[in-house]
Amino acid sequence: LKSSLKVIEKNIDKYFPDEKSIESEATKAMKPKIFISHSSKDVKYVEPIVELLADIGMTNDNLFCSSIPDYGIPLNQDIYEYLSSLFSENELYVIFVLSSNYYGSPACLNEMGAAWVLKNEYTSILLPKFEYQEIDGAVNPNKIGMKLDDDDELLKKRLGELKNIISEKFGISVPDMRWLYS
């Protein structure tokens, strides 16, 4: 009996790993992915964002946008199950594309809530005619975002900051000229 207990004691970590090793294994398994949370009614604004990200090397492996073919939900998949697995299996960086349409969509508000609960990092992009004062819900209205109808210099500055965040998060090098003129 004593020798059996010694064997169990010696190997207990194999069967009951401590919480820190469980957390680190889960974190290692999660790969970064950009999730563009938007209303499908705003697709004309979302398409150029996806094109810009694709031009710098983002693929459907690390970019999700439900309204854009090749970046959305595959055929025969349950929408909510697919979205749930995206949130649980990836380290998402969320780009909220905010508008009145966004706040009128229960699906968008669900995405916002999921990102808030999971404490995902995010950037807010406000569409033309949507103001910071209109930001509501789980998105922090005091967190600096960008407005597509800001003056060109400010918008370029904010886009450059977004490029730097994405470059760091995804380990890619994107020359400024390629980013600004994509």
What do these predicted regions represent?
Residues 38-40, 98-100, 149-150:
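Structural motif
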Residues 32-34, 113, 123, 143:
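Residue-level detector of short, conserved catalytic/binding motifs and their immediate flanks
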Residues 1, 82-133:
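Conserved beta-strand-loop-alpha-helix hinge of the TIR/SEFIR fold
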Residues 1-28, 44-47, 51, 55, ...:
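C-terminal interaction surface of TIR/SEFIR-family domains
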Residues 63, 122-124, 145-147:
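Conserved beta-strand scaffold positions in the cores of enzyme catalytic domains, especially
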Residues 67, 126, 149:
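Residues at the C-termini of beta-strands that transition into short coil/loop
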Residues 11-94, 116-118, 179-181:
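Conserved N-terminal substructure of TIR/SEFIR domains
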